[in-house]
């Protein structure tokens, strides 16, 4: 057992020795080179000092111009040849300071440009250009670094002073130009005032004078007109126009007499025609003809039974005779004759096809045409697939079925066009196999070029317009139901009353029996409803007119009036882009060409088969010769079929007794009707009596009207004369009033023009005042704070003479002359190795002596837990003591300033406790695997240190736990980040390590875990 323990101890010791030697070699190589570089940088003057520039400046605006002094500062440094400058991010600069890549980091703050342009401020804020030097620099290198920063800052301050002087001169120059502009604007205002207002106002009274003259003339004419009109009215006698309404005028009487005579004459003529009807109709002839037809039908019916057998016998004899003639016919071609004819015909056709030059030329022409057609078809397929630069729209995208569905096609169409795309890919592969690499073709990549676009529906929407007229006696309510996928804007007018387009119920005026409905609005698609809308691509709006609160009675058969005015807009056309139709057209065109290509493929070089053509022609002729016997048999079969169907045919012709009987009955009825008509014509018609004496009453009606009509005519003539005179006066008045109206319109137009000009002039004057006020305000700011009372503003003077100050972002380390400062990397490595040794000591003791039991388990069942707590406490206390010792040594070695020492020692103690507790737990619990994990963490740290680059942290640095501890100490020593969160995390890790050591599970059998 002891031998086995010594073997473990020896292995661990060798591993620790190898790790320490490797660490010393690595540190000597890395940091010795850095120290050597530091010494060489002193000897090689300033060009070996690497300076990292971190530009955090944000642009600002001054006098309407964009100012970026941070960029100007960097450009200034780019011309500097004595030092090596690099513009990097803050993280890269800090990493460079840590690993020796940079000696100085200069930070241009965020408000650098804003603070630098404080020429108008009374007390300008100080501008600080921040810088930081690397930890552990030699005193001579640090002095050179300070000198470099000072020189760069002095040069930049000189440039800023030049910028300030240029800005002041520009302000004065702008003021000079603005004064000239003010004078020009004032001159323009005066000129416009004269032309726009002064001259038109001087001409304005003339318009009033013309209007007054025309008004006086019109007033005189109106007075004369009314006087004449009154005179005519006063001289007229109202009795003159009164007519006795008991009588009609003579013209009415004459018209009535004429109409009476016409009707009387028509009546006489009708009576004469009625009397002569019986003489003009020959009914006896019609009746005799029908009776003769009836007798013939009787004879035909009696002959049907005797003629049927004769028909059958005649048909049978004719068919038998025809059958004998056909059976007697024999084929003129014997079998030997047919074979000889086959042989001779074959030889003749072969000779004709072989020696026919026209046929050979035709075959060659067909072959050439097929080759040319195949070449043209292949070129067309190439053009269908490939997209030519700029102008070509007939090409094929490499689209899938899902792409077609997303573009708006249904599943059936998507399957169809997906198959065409696969054909295009198949042809592309065949084409590329035949062509060199430079001529290969490919389908155009698809990137949603033909996807559905709903932006126009979301932004512009779709117009909703409808006009209807609804008539009903019982409609009293309107219900509006809108599409939930759209936002509606607009209104619904019902008999002129407006209602918003939204989901609502509106009570209508029941006094109206007719409703004029006008819908006018816009429906815009909701962004969150785009997916649901694309399922049917239809906008719905329903207006339902009906009755509210109607209760139907059981016996009420009157239906409820409901009028549904529904607007359905299919918006599929608003979704598809032109690219979709172009793509589908290109696919259809390729499909047609490809089918032609597959039909003609493989037939171009196939020779013409003469033998097959000859055999086909000879076989056709021989078949015709041999088919004589078969044709004869077929004809005989047809004759037999005719004989079988002859009885039925004769029965159909002769057995029509029912139709004959019906015709006989109809003829008998017609004869009876004609007999009745004949009796009616034989009777004498009764002549109506007409009283012609009534016409005498109209002859006495016009005698009393002649005198009154004459008197009315005279007065009408006089009234017409007065009216004509009144009309001429009215025309004159109308002309005068029109002139007055024109003058008023001129006054109105002139006044309106004057108002517009006055408003324009007022706006221009207001704009000029605003520009002048702005200039005065801005010019007032120029150097307004250049003096403080009667004295010069010393703060502004000091700022403009030396605007930018340098600010050292001091480290927590004290400068100790030429003494080298230990690196945080070496410090962390030493702490970790010390914790590994401590953990192994605890593990070896427990392995040799067993678990530490400070309290015997016999006294209480909980003593085992107390022993675990005490064991964890001993391990943690050991880490605390080691951390205190290491912290005191490192504090003196790092020369930490007085205000930072307590936090530094606390960080070291917590870090050391974490290392000791975690490493001890790994060895106690998982033994060899724990040792492997500890060494793996150490190896990751070595790799991270070796691969550390100025460009940032690598992947190894991110997964290495020790790298985070290293960064923690580096940031603290450089006073970059607060450590409050770091202390909390370390405390939590200490508690976790303490608890883990309390619950160690001991296995009964020794085994490798």
From Swiss-Prot:
Top-level division of the source organism's lineage: Bacteria
Region annotated Disordered, chain positions: 680-707
Chain's gene name: esaA
Molecular function GO terms recorded: identical protein binding
InterPro entries according to UniProt: T7SS_ABC-Transporter, T7SS_EsaA
Subunit structure: Homodimer. Interacts with EssB.
Function: Component of the type VII secretion system (Ess). Provides together with EssB and other components such as EssC and EssE a secretion platform across the cytoplasmic membrane in the host.
Biased composition (Basic and acidic residues): 680-697
Record membrane topology: Multi-pass membrane protein
Name of this protein: Type VII secretion system accessory factor EsaA
GO cellular component: plasma membrane
Main localization (coarse): membrane
Cell location: Cell membrane
Family: Belongs to the EsaA family.
Spans traversing the lipid bilayer: 7-27, 822-842, 869-889, 903-923, 928-948, 979-999
Keywords from the named record: Cell membrane, Membrane, Transmembrane, Transmembrane helix, Virulence
């Amino acid at each position: 057992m002891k031998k086995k323990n010594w073997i473990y101890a020896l292995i661990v010791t060798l591993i620790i020795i190898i790790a320490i030697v490797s660490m010393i070699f690595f540190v000597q190589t890395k940091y010795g080179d850095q120290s050597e570089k530091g010494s060489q940088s002193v000897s090689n003057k300033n060009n070996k000092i690497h300076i990292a520039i971190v530009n955090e400046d944000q642009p600002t605006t001054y006098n309407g111009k964009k100012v970026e002094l941070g960029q100007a500062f960097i450009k200034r440094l780019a011309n500097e040849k004595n030092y090596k400058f690099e513009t990097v991010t803050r993280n890269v600069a800090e990493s460079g300071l840590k690993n020796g890549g940079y000696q100085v980091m200069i930070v241009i703050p965020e408000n650098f440009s804003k603070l630098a342009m404080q020429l108008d401020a009374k007390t300008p804020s100080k501008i600080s250009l921040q810088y930081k030097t690397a930890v552990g620099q030699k005193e001579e290198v640090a002095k050179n670094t300070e000198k470099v920063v000072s020189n760069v800052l002095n040069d930049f301050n000189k440039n800023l002073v030049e910028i300030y002087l240029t800005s002041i001169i520009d302000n004065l120059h702008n003021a000079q130009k603005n004064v000239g502009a003010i004078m020009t604007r004032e001159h323009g205002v005066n000129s416009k005032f004269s032309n726009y207002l002064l001259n038109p106002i001087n001409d304005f009274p003339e318009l009033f004078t013309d209007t007054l003259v025309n008004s006086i003339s019109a007033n005189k004419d109106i007075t004369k007109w009314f006087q004449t009109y009154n005179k005519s009215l006063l001289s007229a006698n109202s009795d003159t126009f009164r007519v006795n309404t008991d009588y009609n005028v003579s013209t009415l009487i004459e018209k009535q007499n004429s109409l009476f005579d016409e009707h009387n004459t028509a009546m006489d003529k009708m009576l004469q025609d009625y009397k002569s009807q019986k003489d003009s109709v020959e009914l006896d002839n019609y009746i005799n003809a029908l009776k003769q037809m009836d007798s013939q039908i009787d004879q035909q019916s009696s002959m049907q039974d005797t003629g049927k057998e004769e028909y059958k016998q005649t048909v049978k004899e004719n068919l038998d005779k025809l059958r004998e003639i056909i059976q007697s016919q024999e084929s003129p071609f014997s079998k030997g004759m047919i074979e000889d004819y086959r042989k001779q015909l074959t030889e003749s056709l072969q000779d004709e096809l072989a020696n026919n030059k026209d046929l050979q030329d035709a075959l060659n022409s067909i072959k050439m045409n097929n080759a040319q057609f195949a070449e043209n078809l292949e070129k067309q397929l190439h053009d269908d697939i490939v997209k030519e630069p700029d102008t070509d729209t007939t090409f094929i995208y490499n689209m899938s079925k899902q792409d077609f569905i997303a573009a708006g096609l249904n599943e059936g169409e998507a399957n169809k066009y997906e198959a065409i795309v696969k054909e295009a890919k198949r042809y592309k592969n065949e084409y590329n196999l035949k062509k060199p690499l430079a001529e290969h073709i490919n389908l155009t990549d698809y990137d949603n070029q033909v996807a559905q676009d709903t932006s126009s529906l979301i932004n512009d929407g779709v117009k909703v317009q409808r006009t209807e007229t609804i008539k009903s006696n019982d409609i009293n309510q309107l219900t509006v139901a809108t599409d939930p996928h759209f936002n509606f804007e607009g209104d619904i007018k019902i008999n002129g009353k407006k209602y918003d387009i939204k989901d609502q119920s509106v009570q209508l005026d029941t006094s109206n029996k007719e409703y004029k409905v006008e819908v006018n609005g816009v429906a815009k698609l909701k962004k969150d409803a785009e997916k649901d809308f694309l399922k049917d691509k239809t906008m719905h709006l329903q207006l339902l007119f009906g009755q509210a609160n109607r209760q139907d009675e059981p016996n009420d058969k009157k239906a409820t009036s409901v009028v549904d005015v529904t607007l359905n807009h299919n918006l599929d056309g608003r979704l598809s882009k032109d690219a979709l139709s172009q793509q589908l057209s290109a696919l259809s065109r390729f499909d047609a060409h490809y089918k032609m290509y597959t039909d003609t493929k493989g037939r171009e070089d196939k020779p013409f088969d003469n033998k097959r053509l000859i055999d086909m022609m000879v076989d056709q002729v021989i078949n015709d010769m041999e088919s004589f016997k078969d044709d004869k048999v077929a004809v005989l079969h047809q004759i037999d079929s005719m004989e079988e169907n002859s009885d039925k045919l004769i029965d159909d012709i002769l057995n029509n007794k029912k139709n004959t009987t019906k015709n006989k009955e109809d003829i008998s009825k017609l004869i009876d009707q004609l007999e009745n008509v004949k009796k009616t014509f034989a009777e004498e018609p009764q002549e109506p009596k007409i009283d012609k004496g009534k016409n005498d009453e109209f002859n006495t009606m016009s005698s009393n009207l002649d005198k009154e009509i004459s008197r009315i005519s005279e007065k009408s003539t006089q009234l017409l004369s007065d009216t004509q005179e009144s009309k001429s006066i009215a025309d004159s008045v109308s002309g005068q009033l029109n002139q007055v109206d024109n003058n008023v319109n001129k006054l109105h137009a002139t006044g309106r023009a004057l108002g517009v000009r006055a408003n324009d002039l007022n706006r221009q004057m207001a704009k000029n005042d605003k520009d002048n006020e702005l200039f005065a305000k801005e010019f007032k700011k120029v150097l307004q704070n250049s003096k403080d009372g009667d004295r010069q503003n010393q703060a502004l003077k000091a700022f403009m003479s030396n605007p930018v100050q340098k600010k050292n972002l001091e480290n927590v380390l004290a400068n100790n002359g030429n003494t080298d400062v230990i690196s945080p990397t070496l410090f962390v490595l030493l702490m970790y190795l010390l914790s590994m040794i401590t953990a192994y000591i605890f593990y070896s003791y427990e392995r040799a002596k067993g678990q530490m039991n400070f309290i015997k388990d016999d006294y209480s069942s909980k003593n085992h837990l107390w022993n675990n707590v005490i064991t964890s406490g001993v391990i943690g206390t050991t880490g605390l003591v080691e951390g205190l010792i290491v912290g005191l040594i490192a504090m003196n070695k790092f020369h930490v300033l007085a205000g930072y020492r307590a936090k530094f020692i606390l960080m070291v103690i917590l870090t050391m406790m974490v290392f000791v507790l975690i490493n001890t737990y790994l060895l106690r619990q998982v033994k060899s695997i724990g040792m492997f994990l500890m060494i793996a963490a150490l190896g990751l740290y070595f790799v991270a240190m070796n691969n550390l680059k100025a460009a940032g942290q690598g992947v190894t640095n991110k997964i290495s736990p020790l790298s985070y501890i290293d960064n923690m100490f580096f940031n603290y020593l450089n006073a970059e980040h607060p450590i409050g969160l770091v202390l909390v995390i370390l405390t939590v890790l200490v508690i976790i390590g303490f608890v883990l050591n309390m619950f160690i599970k001991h296995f009964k059998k020794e085994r490798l875990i």
